[in-house]
From Swiss-Prot:
This is UDP-N-acetylenolpyruvoylglucosamine reductase. HAMAP family: MurB. PROSITE patterns: FAD_PCMH. The active site is at 159, 229 (proton donor), 325.
Length: 342
């Protein structure tokens, strides 16, 4: 007996898992993990499946993390939120704004659960989770022991954290602690936000502008399956960026604190005239080249072939090799996404 994963991944790819368990508390989560381990099955914990591509049927147990709850403590200088890992991220952003606690508005409409946010160190429009994260609570899957990691201990990087490295498959995130400063400073460095006046802008206006940009550029997964930005924005050495800018002076580029330069993957793909290109049922989105969509009952093979095609074209033109932001899941667990499309 197998269970379809189609409802549990926003790409809408139709693969199956041996078992799917919905965990609404820590005990259910640990019990499901221990049961699978006893049976010698692979096991993975999934939020809303908005950043994964299942390559084939999964041979084990998928645990859906649905631990809910939001607690707020107010101090003189900040609001401290303790949020269950199974809460929806965008609903949390709205909750904070509705309760006059600004600071998350640039991260509006990022799909997925709160518990997934530190894994990827989610970010958009100049703000990353690490800017507001206070701590992450997790449990060791083998022992059931509770751990609280400070933001520094999470070792956040660009779409990276300790949870994608040493702690992968070792812990389950059960809650995230956020600190929202009462000295709110709008971040208006990207897109339409640069048109807003930092002296008069409200958090609600930033939220509305971010939602407008995302809804006009990004496809709704309910209409066309997708996992948001498929590729990371490449971060390259300064000399490589200089060389590229000599050839393409209008290329968007963002100098980083360490001297490296972040490039816009969507722009690179667009310059290769790849918008609308299809392989099988998979397509490059016509409005936002960074997004690959399930346009017509795509298989995972279609998506992988399209991602390979995009990576090759960009690499040949710019000598910059894109890496997927989406996580690739094989029969027994996560596999190397770069190798899968190389």
């Amino acid at each position: 007996m197998t269970h379809s994963l189609k409802p549990w991944n926003t790409f809408g790819i139709d693969h199956c898992a041996k078992h799917i368990v919905c965990a609404e508390n820590e005990q259910q989560l640990l019990s499901a993990w221990q049961q699978a381990t006893r049976e010698g099955l692979p096991v993975m914990i999934l939020g809303e499946g908005s950043n994964v591509l299942f390559l084939e049927n999964y041979a084990g147990t998928v645990i859906l993390n649905r631990l809910k709850g939001i607690e707020v403590n107010e101090t003189a200088d900040a609001w401290h939120l303790h949020v269950g890992a199974g809460e929806n991220w965008h609903q949390l952003v709205r909750y904070a704004l509705d309760n006059n606690m600004p600071g998350l508005e640039n991260l509006a409409l990022i799909p997925g659960c709160v518990g997934s946010s530190p894994i990827q160190n989610i970010g958009a429009y100049g703000v990353e989770l690490q800017c507001v994260c206070d701590y992450v609570d997790c449990v060791e899957l083998e022992t059931g022991k509770r751990l609280r990691l400070s933001a520094a201990e999470c070792r956040f990087g660009y779409r990276d954290s300790i949870f994608k490295n040493e702690y992968q498959d070792r812990v389950a995130i059960v809650a995230v602690g956020l600190r929202l400063s009462k000295q709110w400073q709008p971040v208006l460095t990207y897109g339409d936000l640069t048109c807003l006046d930092p002296k008069t802008v409200t958090a609600q206006q930033v939220f509305d502008a971010v939602c407008h940009m995302r809804t006009t550029k990004l496809p709704d997964p309910k209409v066309n399956g997708n996992a948001g930005s498929f590729f990371k924005n490449p971060v390259v050495a300064a000399d490589i960026a200089m060389e590229l800018l000599e050839r393409f002076p209008n290329a968007p580029h963002y100098p980083q604190a360490d001297g490296s330069v972040k490039l816009a993957a969507g722009w690179l793909i667009d310059q290769c005239q790849l918008k609308g290109v299809t392989i099988g049922g998979a397509a490059v989105h016509r409005q936002q080249a960074l997004v690959l969509i399930n346009a017509n009952d795509a298989t995972s093979k279609d998506v992988v072939a399209l991602a390979h095609h995009v990576r090759q074209k960009v690499g040949e033109k710019f000598n910059v090799w894109l890496e997927p932001e989406v996580r690739f899941i094989g029969q027994f667990g996560e596999v190397n996404a770069v190798e899968s499309i190389a």
